[in-house]
Regions:
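Membrane-interface interhelical connector segments
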Residues: 93-118
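Pore-lining and gate-forming transmembrane alpha-helices of multi-pass membrane transport proteins
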Residues: 157, 185-198
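Structural signature of hydrophobic alpha-helical transmembrane segments
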Residues: 45-54
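N-terminal membrane topogenic signal
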Residues: 4-20
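Internal alpha-helical transmembrane segments of multi-pass membrane proteins
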Residues: 144-163
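Transmembrane alpha-helix/helix-exit interface in multi-pass inner-membrane proteins
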Residues: 84-102, 123, 127, 131
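Short, highly charged, low-complexity non-transmembrane loops/tails of multi-pass membrane proteins
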Residues: 212-226
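Alpha-helical transmembrane segments of multi-pass membrane proteins
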Residues: 22-37
Length: 226
């Protein structure tokens, strides 16, 4: 149940959580420019560098939605969207600025940070749809079935959100650009990896949510709504 709005005290931890969310998102977007494989040359799984940190944005998104509600979570998600777009626009401008006479890394800069707008659209569309769905589904499950079974809210929202994110991102960016087998490999591997990580980190997510509620002066299962 939401905390009454009688107090004007601002949220104590929301700013720190928001910064962590946006930072993980931006780092993941840059790391995602490299694809790598796990396995042998004949039997392998394909990931991108974003797989290391990006799933944590869904866990933080769960924390935001569970403790602060959909409205505040949505604001942080939009902040991440704006920051990602601004980063892409900055890299695009810098990429086409004339390099200094003694600057020898123009091709390397373009290869790593150079903007391909198809990739930008894929990333932003997948991120926005996935994160908003993740937050909405978690709050919807809570309202529909009550505050019990937090694990079901966390996993259920991730299943829906990551599906939208992964399918949109992979389809826009890679469909028709790689063999169909590699496309399926990349899409399915990325999706199940992210969902599995949510499950594995449940023992961490639970105490984190409880700790943030204590910081905000909330009782168990209360939502910060001030």
């Amino acid at each position: 149940s939401p905390v009454p709005s009688g107090s004007a005290r601002p949220a104590r931890a929301l700013d720190i959580i928001s910064v962590a969310f946006v930072a993980l998102l931006l780092i993941s977007n840059i790391a995602a420019t490299k694809a790598f494989m796990v396995g042998s040359s004949t039997h392998y799984l394909i990931f991108d560098g974003g797989a290391i940190l990006f799933p944590l944005t869904y866990i933080i998104g769960d924390v935001l939605s569970e403790v602060y509600g959909f409205a505040r979570a949505r604001r942080v998600i939009v902040m991440g969207f704006v920051a990602s777009f601004l980063a892409s626009l900055t890299f695009f401008i810098v990429q086409y600025l004339p390099p200094a006479p003694d600057y020898e890394n123009q091709e390397a800069f373009a290869a790593v940070l150079g903007v391909v707008w198809r990739a930008v659209v894929a990333s932003l569309a997948g991120y926005l749809a996935g994160q908003l769905l993740n937050s909405y589904v978690l709050v919807w499950i809570r309202r529909r079935w009550g505050t019990k079974h937090l694990w079901a809210r966390l996993i259920g929202s991730t299943i829906v959100g990551e599906a939208a994110d992964t399918i949109l991102f992979c389809t826009i960016l890679f469909y028709g650009q790689m063999t169909f087998g590699n496309f399926v490999n990349y899409t399915v591997t990325g999706y199940f990896y992210k969902v599995l990580l949510e499950v594995v980190l449940l023992p961490v997510t639970y105490p984190v949510i409880a700790a943030i509620r204590r910081v905000e002066g909330l009782k168990k299962d209360e939502v910060f709504d001030r």
